[in-house]
Amino acid sequence: MYGGEDFNNTQQDFYDDYAHTGDPALDLEYERNYYANRMPENVKYFLINFCQAIKEGNLYDIQNMYENTFPQISDHHFDKSAWPEEQEVGAIVDNDKVFLILYKELYYRHIHARIPGGPKLDQRINSFFNYCDFFNLIISAQNPVLLELPDIWLWELVDEFVYQFQNFAQYRARLTDKSQDEIQQLCVNHSNVWSILCILNVLHSLVDISNIKKQLEAISQGIDPQTVAGDFGKLAFYKMLGYFSLVGLLRVHSLLGDYYQAIKVLEPIEIHKKSAYSHIPACQISTSYYVGFAYMMMRRYADAIRTFSDILLYIQRTKQLYSTRSYQNDQINKQAEQMYHLLAICLVLHPQCIDESIQQVLREKNYHDAMFKMQCGDLEVFKSFFVFACPRFVSPCPPVADAPLEDYVKDPMEHQLLVFMDEVRQQKDLPTTRSYLKLYTTLPLTKLASFIDPNANEDDVSKLLIRLLCFKHKMRNLVWSKGPSGLEGTFKSGSELDFYIDDDMIHIADTKVSHRYGDFFVRKIMKFNDLNRKLKNINI
């Protein structure tokens, strides 16, 4: 097979294409030519120009190539395959260290997003070490690294870092499809790869080195943030990485089920107000999703409803900003759909008025049918809505090497679902109680007990008192009013009615705020006038 003439000819052909001379300069030139000839011309041209733009810090060109050219080439040449490997790219960009780290970040991100079957174990590990190289480069430096990248790339870099941690945690928890050798690699040889401590350490280090918390506090007090930014935080590169790392920490703690800490890490950010840092739509939407979900799990339904309503209105009004980027559009649409599901849950558990345009979407998408079933105590609808809309939870502790060969991916999800459904069961009967109370201004306890159960006795009246106390308790929530901390607030009753019991008589007061129909009609009139102007300008 490999004998004589055939082998010699093959060997000669190989050395004709890629010869080593012993001279490092000549060998580098041979290597450059060898890989350049294998690469499509437009890919080679793009990589050379991309490297040059990053070297020169030309933000406009970097952003254009990152947001437009890279996805276009990916669609055309690498739709279901990987981009060229580091060795091939290094040969045509003079092995530029910084560029190769950034290129590999895009390379592994592309593999996670596009390659059927997802990345292999060695690719997941190499991606982790590439992130380590990048963060060590910018955090361990004695002086600030003079690197400029567009804010959208910095956000997506941090977001992808957290996503790959989440993806690896789920991959590691699925032992049923792995050999003993793979389990040994994961649990023993590479036990620190994508560990929760590494992720938290990186994100907190970026927050600390940028002094972003001090800068945000200075802004809230009307002080120039540059006075507290420090040498690193003065640069937009470090400042934005620090801000996005706060959002990354919010996401990580939410994935772990630590909702108090998730909100606490955002304390310098006034999450219910717009800021100069919230100009990346995907970042703002992701922040609101995790904040709203954390509020819901903490039983702060009024804050969750406000958070979801505000961001869903924002999505309605700014859709054109991200609709040109299909992958981002898909991600935002999915997150918006999840938030509508969570909003529907919150409105069932804590009824209140919301913006008419959000109500209209809920009607158009038939959420009201599901909401009616939830109000009637259908626990399966609650469960299906929660499973669709919640984050993909992970466990901070991976399975040990000698654990039974089972699928542990669903364990964190099932635990959070159990906690949520326990709360729902406690509130299951409250809509029925509310519906009777809304019909009266005074109502004897015995009469209400007979409405709920026609065969009610004295014991049932005692149980009714417990139910009414539960109603009072569940409808009284901690609600944020002001201040930089999303954990602060005052206790308020969120129900449309309030009541007290005097002897055996329930006294009921309707506290419902009437709809402001004027605003709705003004918006519709303005929309109609705008449409009328456009029609008049059309030449037929």
From Swiss-Prot:
Annotated family: Belongs to the eIF-3 subunit L family.
Q: Which SUPFAM superfamilies match?
A: TPR-like
- Any one Gene Ontology BP term: formation of cytoplasmic translation initiation complex
Kindly list the GO molecular function terms attached to this UniProt entry: translation initiation factor activity
One Pfam family per UniProt: Paf67
This protein's record includes keyword Protein biosynthesis: yes
Q: Please tell me the species this chain comes from.
A: Drosophila grimshawi (Hawaiian fruit fly)
Q: How does it assemble?
A: Component of the eukaryotic translation initiation factor 3 (eIF-3) complex. The eIF-3 complex interacts with pix.
Keyword field:
Cytoplasm, Initiation factor, Protein biosynthesis
CC terms in the record's Gene Ontology section: eukaryotic 43S preinitiation complex; eukaryotic 48S preinitiation complex; eukaryotic translation initiation factor 3 complex
Residue ranges annotated for the PCI domain, each copy included: 307-515
Q: How is this protein named in the record?
A: Eukaryotic translation initiation factor 3 subunit L
The protein's matches in PROSITE patterns, at most eight in alphabetical order, are given as: PCI
Purpose: Component of the eukaryotic translation initiation factor 3 (eIF-3) complex, which is involved in protein synthesis of a specialized repertoire of mRNAs and, together with other initiation factors, stimulates binding of mRNA and methionyl-tRNAi to the 40S ribosome. The eIF-3 complex specifically targets and initiates translation of a subset of mRNAs involved in cell proliferation.
Q: Where can this protein be found? A: Cytoplasm
